[in-house]
Curated annotation (Swiss-Prot):
GO terms for cellular component: axon; dendrite; extracellular space; synaptic vesicle. Residues 19-125 form a propeptide. This is Venom nerve growth factor 1. The keyword Signal applies. GO terms for molecular function: growth factor activity; lipid binding; metalloendopeptidase inhibitor activity; nerve growth factor receptor binding; toxin activity. It comes from Hoplocephalus stephensii. Expressed by the venom gland. Keywords: Cleavage on pair of basic residues, Disulfide bond, Glycoprotein, Growth factor, Lipid-binding, Metalloenzyme inhibitor, Metalloprotease inhibitor, Protease inhibitor, Secreted, Signal, Toxin.
Length: 243
């Protein structure tokens, strides 16, 4: 009997010793911990990939300034708009480079090259000699190339947006306007030069005319008649005290 009890006790102890240990007591670096670390790394990597893909699908919103600049630069003009000659005006120029002196090669304020200016003035004097050196203009005018016109009044009296840059065939052109205005409303103390100040009041004023220009209509480019300065004239008013 004692032998049987002794045998059962030994078998019980051997069974306890041979039983597998709990995962809670597994030391660091054991296979169970390695599998858990690999699983965590895999989940983290998948999370990073998912986050990266989400960022690519939903990019960060751009600034308002960038959006406005991009929308203005992405407006493409149909080349067919320039095929009809009736839309062309001698005072409107589309060019990738600064415009020339002027239509008749007279002095304008746009130029920075003094030598080129002097050459063109001399050429004009040779082509159109002045026989009477006493000739003077009634009003003094100045002609300029306007390079940054953004607003103008159309033929209906509405304020419209003028296109400064025109994207044509993947090349950016600038829209230039050749404008003429009065340098001074009173070139002489009495008003216009050469008038009889005893009987007339006079002054110089800038007049406008309509030219076709590319303007914005929603997200499309369209031709419109707009007003620009084109001349300087003398206005005379009869003095009433002579009647």
């Amino acid at each position: 009997m004692s032998m049987l009890c002794y045998t059962l006790i030994i078998a019980f102890l051997i069974g306890i010793w041979a039983a597998p240990k709990s995962e809670d007591n597994v030391p660091l670096g054991s296979p169970a911990t390695s599998d858990l670390s690999d699983t965590s790394c895999a989940q983290t990597h998948e999370g990073l990939k998912t986050s990266r893909n989400t960022d690519q699908r939903h990019p960060a919103p751009k600034k308002a300034e960038d959006q406005e600049l991009g929308s203005a630069a992405n407006i493409i003009v149909n080349p067919k708009l320039f095929q009809k000659r009736r839309f062309q005006s001698p005072r409107v120029l589309f060019s990738t480079q600064p415009p020339p002196l002027s239509r008749d090669e007279q002095s304008v304020e746009f130029l920075d090259n003094e030598d080129a200016l002097n050459r063109n003035i001399r050429a004009k004097r040779e082509n159109h000699p002045v026989h009477n050196r006493g000739e003077h203009s009634v009003c003094d005018s100045i002609s300029v190339w306007v390079t940054n016109k953004t607003k103008a009044t159309d033929i209906k009296g509405n304020m419209v947006t003028v296109m400064v840059d025109v994207n044509l065939n993947n090349e950016v052109y600038k829209q230039y306007f050749f404008e003429t205005k009065c340098r001074n409303p009173n070139p002489v103390p009495s008003g216009c030069r050469g008038t009889d100040s005893r009987h007339w009041n006079s002054y110089c004023t800038t007049t406008q005319t309509f030219v076709r220009a590319l303007t914005m209509e929603g997200n499309r480019a369209s031709w419109r008649f707009i007003r620009i300065d084109t001349a300087c004239v003398c206005v005379i008013i009869r003095k009433t005290d002579n009647f």
